[in-house]
Every structure is written in C-alpha cells, then in structure tokens.
Amino acid sequence: MSLRERCARLLEALGRRFGIEGLAFDERGLCALAFDRRMTVYLAADTRLGGMVLFATLGEFEPAERPDLLLAMLRGNFMWRVTEGATLAVDPEKDVALLVQCLSPQGLEADQLEARLEGFVNAALSWAERLQRPPAGAPERAGLAGMMLRV
C-alpha cells in the first residue's frame, strides 16, 4: 500500500472516530479540521517526507519585532518538550508562525493519530495564545480612554 493510500485510510478511520463519514483529502491533497472554532489543523500525505504532515498557522509574526518570542520558540523546539513533538517555524514569505509535525503512518492506528492530533492541537492553541500576548515589559493598552487627549 502506498503512503498516500495509508494516510487516506488513516484519515477515513479518524473521521469515523469523530463521527465524520467520508473524511478525506481534497483535490490538493489537504484535509482541514477546525477545533473549537479557534484552530484549524491541516493534514497532508507528504511523499517527500514519508509521512502524514500536520500543520497549523499560529498567527502573524515578525521576528525582528519580537526577538523575545523568537527565542521562546527556539527554546520550545528544544527536544520538543513543549510542542508535543512538533516544530515551531516562521514562514519567511508570509511572516506567520506555524506548528508543523510529520508522523510516520507505519503502525499508526486511528486512536493513536487522534491522541497525537489532540496533543498537536493543544500545543498549537497554547502557542497561538502566546503569540497574541504583548512582549514582556510592554505598556498595557488602555483602550479608547488611553488614546484620548484632554483639551
């Protein structure tokens, strides 16, 4: 069985676990799953890497403006301790932060994929939230009142 076939069968079995009959890759080879309307995770069979790739966009990110966050992302990648085995990255063309993971489909069952996906989603949500926080020491926004001038 080819990698694409194995990944397609895994995805279909995952869909059954979620109560989604016929879950499959689209014509581009992607499957998008939305979680709590807060995070979309894409799955794809990648023959170049030999696995099923999970990826999620965490938000806009300009590394030069947030060196503190860039350092946190590098530290987060160390031994994958706080990324559930995934890797944090920055898309240089779009200035967005991503979480990416490649899973070997060999011996992977739908329940194991579900568990890995859950860990991935939790890590993605955590890092997306962290991306939205202002840098340490940044002045707090005061809303409209803070922007008003007294005349």
Where are the model-predicted features located?
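Ampiphathic alpha-helical segments that act as solvent-exposed interaction surfaces
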Residues: 72, 103-134
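Short, highly charged C-terminal tails/helix-capping segments
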Residues: 131-151
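Hydrophobic residues embedded in beta-strands of well-ordered beta-sheets
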Residues: 31, 50-52, 95-97
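Charge-rich, low-complexity N-terminal segments
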Residues: 1-41
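Structural motif
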Residues: 27, 46-48, 93
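Short, internal acidic amphipathic alpha-helical interface segments
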Residues: 57-102
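A short acidic-to-branched-hydrophobic micro-motif
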Residues: 41-45, 50-60
